[in-house]
Swiss-Prot record:
Glycans are attached at residues 52, 58. It is found in: Golgi apparatus membrane. This is Probable N-acetylgalactosaminyltransferase 8. It comes from Caenorhabditis elegans. Residues 1-3 are cytoplasmic. Belongs to the glycosyltransferase 2 family. GalNAc-T subfamily. InterPro entries: GalNAc-T, Glyco_trans_2-like, Nucleotide-diphossugar_trans. Residues 25-421 are lumenal.
Length: 421
């Protein structure tokens, strides 16, 4: 706990200092990438322009509207993002000992990005960062799959123009679904377009740090049935400041609510623990690497799920119970914009998060199913659809039961649920 408090103080102090320094700089020029893509792509990094991209004094009417539109549409400040520009080097965010690590995994890699109602500036900055900070020998392609964005937010034409300007037609696979698939099914459809040996699923508002990919590939070489996670750093939704986050495992409670599990200070006093991958009971879901062949072997995501929610729990359980593992690679760092809220809608008339969670519970919890419904009683009466396919995967892979998972992977899950206390 002391480690978390001390690091948080340093991070906060650094942000305050950076903000104070930025306030002394003039307001950045605003170039709108939707209207002038070439001009926006020509913008130099902030370090060269010497301006403040977050300053809200003396905004023009167009700038004010852009800021308000961004917060309403994306739950982050699109004006700050556009003024930040197309390129940013967030530097080396991992522990200094990571610089000494040697990696020899050489899988061709496809980065798979699903976007629905996404801001153009964030996705283009992410693509530029992936291209710049990934070895050419490893990056096979980036799959950009647009899941039926609403009319004002369709990016496919902008992305095609970007690919032509940058000469990336052979590196970017740009596809659009005219009908809303939802994040889960869209990920499956997009992954089927990928031709790399490894797929990296990445949310559409991320930025990679230097040497982000190599640490993700090495554990896969050591165990091909690995799902490998980076450390997810924080990008502020208003200022877009990049801040390193605590190294942590991922977990969940009996209601499948995700949570971070922070490692004790003493763990990191052993130098090698700052660099070596470690097991995690679960995953956040937005950022992960695995062999495409293994993803298919696991039955991909459950195509009976709707929109978003619990797919991370399902994939975690499938990996652990069916002969694989989930690990965190602390030397891999990827920043993620943590938005103010989830700005897109679910399926009308349906609690999709609960629906998906019930499907996972019915498929994987077995004798522990009652613990889930004690936390989520509304789910007990919910119609959850056909489970034939996920059950066939479970049988085909001869998966272990939930008791094994608790005893061998996640003993912290065993305490009684609230209504039994």
């Amino acid at each position: 706990m002391r480690r978390h408090v001390v690091l948080s103080i340093f991070v906060f102090a650094g942000i305050v200092f950076a903000a104070e320094e930025a306030e002394k700089l003039p307001k950045c020029e605003h170039v709108d990438p939707y209207e002038n893509l070439e001009g926006w792509l020509d913008l130099k990094p902030l370090t060269e322009r010497k301006c403040n991209h977050t300053l809200k004094e003396n905004l023009t009417e167009a700038e004010s509207k852009k800021s308000e539109w961004g917060i309403k549409s994306f739950a982050f400040d699109a004006l700050s993002s556009e003024k930040l520009g197309p390129n940013r080097n967030v530097g080396k965010q991992a522990h200094k000992l990571c610089e000494e690590e040697k990696y020899d995994a050489s899988y061709s890699t496809s980065v798979v990005v699903i976007h629905h109602n996404e801001a153009l500036s964030t996705i283009l900055r992410m693509i530029n960062g992936i291209i710049e900070f990934t070895p050419k020998s490893l990056l096979k392609e980036i799959v950009l799959y647009e899941d039926a964005s609403e009319e004002d937010h369709v990016l496919t034409k902008h992305l095609e123009k970007f690919a032509k300007i940058k000469g990336l037609e052979d590196k970017l696979i740009i596809k659009r679904s005219e009908y809303r698939q939802g994040l889960i099914r869209a990920k499956v459809h997009a992954s089927r377009l990928a031709t790399g040996e490894v797929i990296v699923f990445m949310d559409s508002h991320c930025e990679v740090a230097e040497r982000w990919l190599e640490p993700l590939l090495q554990p896969i070489k050591e165990d091909p049935k690995s799902i490998v996670l980076p450390v997810v750093d924080l990008i502020n939704p208003v200022s877009f400041d990049y801040s390193p986050s605590m190294v942590a495992k991922s977990g969940f409670d009996w209601g499948f609510t995700f949570k971070w599990i922070y490692l004790p200070w003493e763990y990191f006093e052993t130098p090698e623990n700052n660099v070596k991958p470690f097991n995690s009971p679960a995953m956040p879901g937005g950022l992960l690497a695995m062999r495409k062949e293994y993803f298919v072997e696991l039955g991909e995501y459950d195509m009976g799920m709707e929109i978003w929610g619990s797919e991370n729990i399902e994939l975690s359980l499938k990996a652990w119970l069916c002969g694989g593992r989930v690990v965190v690679a602390p030397c891999s760092r990827v920043g993620h914009v943590f938005r103010m809220r989830r700005p897109y809608t679910s399926k009308p008339g349906m609690d999709t998060a609960l629906y998906n969670a019930v499907r996972v519970a019915k498929t994987w919890l077995g004798e522990y199913e009652s613990k889930f419904f004690a936390v989520k009683p509304r789910g007990a009466k919910m119609v959850f659809g056909d489970l034939t396919e996920p059950m066939q995967v479970k049988d085909r892979l001869k998966c272990k039961d939930m008791k094994w998972f608790i005893e061998n992977v996640y003993p912290e899950l065993e305490p009684k649920v609230h209504d039994e206390l």
